[in-house]
Amino acid sequence: MIQPLSKLVVADNTGAKEIMCIRVLGGSKHRYGTVGDLIVASVKKAEPNAAVKKGDVVYAVIVRTKKEYRRKDGSYIKFDDNAAVLVTPQGQPRGTRIFGPVARELREKHYMRIISLAPEVW
């Protein structure tokens, strides 16, 4: 469950290390974001000489959440951290590598490029 002001780890090689959610996209009543949701975020920590800089406003897709997520088969999945991957406004990843596992729900949301770059899909 990601809401405005939530901090997330960045799980790609764009150079950003930590982002803060500004808005969960998808309607005026869409208060909380879960796996596969698109958010607008601000870069809070970044590496020097990176593609993104501290203070940049970026789009990101949530790939892992600490809060458990109920799947249609009745099982639950949760991760050790809240993580996101930076994307373009069209939904294509900005980085060329993704670190750590991502949830299978990204396939249902049609983020196939993120799925193909990820080392593990849970």
From Swiss-Prot:
Gene3D superfamilies, per the entry: Ribosomal protein L14
GO cellular component: cytosolic large ribosomal subunit
Keyword Ribonucleoprotein in record: yes
GO molecular function: large ribosomal subunit rRNA binding; structural constituent of ribosome
Cited InterPro entries: Ribosomal_uL14, Ribosomal_uL14_bac-type, Ribosomal_uL14_CS, Ribosomal_uL14_sf
One Gene Ontology biological process: translation
Keywords, alphabetical: Ribonucleoprotein, Ribosomal protein, RNA-binding, rRNA-binding
PANTHER family recorded: 50S/60S RIBOSOMAL PROTEIN L14/L23, LARGE RIBOSOMAL SUBUNIT PROTEIN UL14M
Family: Belongs to the universal ribosomal protein uL14 family.
HAMAP family documented for this protein: Ribosomal_uL14
Quaternary organization: Part of the 50S ribosomal subunit. Forms a cluster with proteins L3 and L19. In the 70S ribosome, L14 and L19 interact and together make contacts with the 16S rRNA in bridges B5 and B8.
Name of the protein this chain belongs to: Large ribosomal subunit protein uL14
Species this chain originates from: Thermomicrobium roseum (strain ATCC 27502 / DSM 5159 / P-2)
Upper taxonomic lineage: Bacteria, Pseudomonadati, Thermomicrobiota, Thermomicrobia, Thermomicrobiales
Gene name of this polypeptide: rplN
